[in-house]
C-alpha cells in the first residue's frame, strides 16, 4: 500500500543522513505523492502504467516502481535543475542494487508523446519551468489511455506572486520584472530565465478550446496551508510571504475558509484532466 510514511522510509534508506538537498528531494516527493494518491485510488486495478513528468531526483518514481507499478520517469535535467543529477545517481544506484526497475526518458515534455500508453500522468511544480507548457499538456493528454487521468500542480500567475523567488510581480512582463528585481533575480538567474508565467485563466481557456474534460481542485490552497501546520520542513521551504500569511490565517482561525477563494485567485493550482 502506498503511503507517505513508506516513502519516507524508502528515502531514508537511500540517504541515511537526511540533510540538505536529499531532505528537500524527499519532502518534494512526499508532497507529490500526497497529491497523486487520490488519483491512483480512482483506478480499479493495481498494475497500471504511470508517467511522472519532471521526475527530478527520481525518488518518487523509484518508490512507485518498488511497489510494483509500471513507471516511466521523464526528466531532461535542464541547466536550472542540474543539482538533481547527483541525487538521481544515488537513487539509481540504490535501484540497481535492489532490483527496482523503471523506465527513464531524457526528453522535454514538449517533445515526448506515446499515444494511449498511460493510465496516470502527473507533473508536480514543473509546467512553469517549460518553454511551452500547453504543448506539453497536449502531449500528455494524447499519451493517456481511455479512461486515464492527468494531474498537474503548478503556480497560478493570475496571482501576481512568483514563489521561487518570493517576489510580487508587476504586470505580466518578465523583462519589466527582471529590471525591478534585478538583485533578487541575479541569485537565481537560471531558474528565472526558465520560468513561464502559466495562468489559470489561459489554461482554462485552452482546455475549453480543446474540449478536454477537466476540474480544478478548490481545496488545493487550503490543503497546502493545512500541511504547513503538520510539516515543519515543508513550512521552512515556503517563501517568507507564505509563512507570514499562514501565521496570520492560523491565528485568525480561518484557514478552512481558503476553500472559498475563487479558483482564479488560488496559487498553486491543481488540475485534474480526465480522458
At which residue positions do the language-model features occur?
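S-adenosyl-L-methionine-dependent methyltransferase catalytic module, highlighting the catalytic core
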Residues: 88, 134-139, 149-274
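Helix-to-beta-strand junctions that scaffold the AdoMet/dcAdoMet cofactor pocket
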Residues: 130-131, 144-146
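A structural alpha-helix within SAM-dependent methyltransferase catalytic domains
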Residues: 62-65, 137-141
Amino acid at each position: 500500500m502506498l503511503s507517505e510514511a513508506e516513502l519516507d522510509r524508502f528515502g531514508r534508506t537511500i540517504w541515511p543522513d537526511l540533510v540538505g538537498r536529499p531532505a528537500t528531494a524527499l519532502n518534494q516527493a512526499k508532497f507529490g505523492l500526497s497529491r497523486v494518491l487520490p488519483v491512483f485510488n480512482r483506478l480499479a486495478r493495481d498494475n497500471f502504467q504511470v508517467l511522472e513528468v519532471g521526475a527530478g531526483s527520481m525518488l518518487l518514481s523509484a518508490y512507485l516502481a518498488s511497489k510494483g507499478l509500471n513507471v516511466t520517469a521523464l526528466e531532461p535535467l535542464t541547466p536550472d535543475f542540474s543539482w538533481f543529477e547527483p541525487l538521481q545517481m544515488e537513487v539509481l544506484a540504490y535501484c540497481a542494487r535492489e532490483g527496482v526497475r523503471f523506465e527513464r526518458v531524457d526528453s522535454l515534455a514538449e517533445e515526448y508523446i506515446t499515444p494511449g500508453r498511460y493510465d496516470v500522468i502527473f507533473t508536480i511544480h514543473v509546467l512553469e519551468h517549460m518553454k511551452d507548457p500547453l504543448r506539453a499538456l497536449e502531449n500528455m493528454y494524447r499519451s493517456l489511455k481511455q479512461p486515464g487521468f492527468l494531474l498537474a500542480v503548478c503556480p497560478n500567475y493570475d496571482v501576481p506572486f512568483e514563489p521561487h523567488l518570493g517576489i510580487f510581480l508587476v504586470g505580466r512582463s518578465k523583462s519589466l520584472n527582471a529590471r525591478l528585481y534585478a538583485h533578487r533575480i541575479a541569485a537565481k538567474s537560471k531558474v528565472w530565465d526558465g520560468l513561464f508565467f502559466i495562468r489559470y485563466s489561459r489554461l482554462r481557456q485552452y482546455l475549453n478550446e480543446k474540449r478536454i474534460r477537466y476540474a480544478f481542485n478548490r481545496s488545493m490552497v487550503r490543503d497546502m496551508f493545512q500541511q504547513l501546520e503538520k510539516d515543519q520542513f515543508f513550512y521552512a521551504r515556503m517563501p517568507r510571504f507564505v509563512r507570514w500569511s499562514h501565521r496570520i490565517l492560523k491565528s485568525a482561525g480561518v484557514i478552512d475558509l481558503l476553500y472559498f477563494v475563487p479558483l482564479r485567485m488560488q496559487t498553486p493550482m491543481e488540475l485534474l484532466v480526465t480522458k
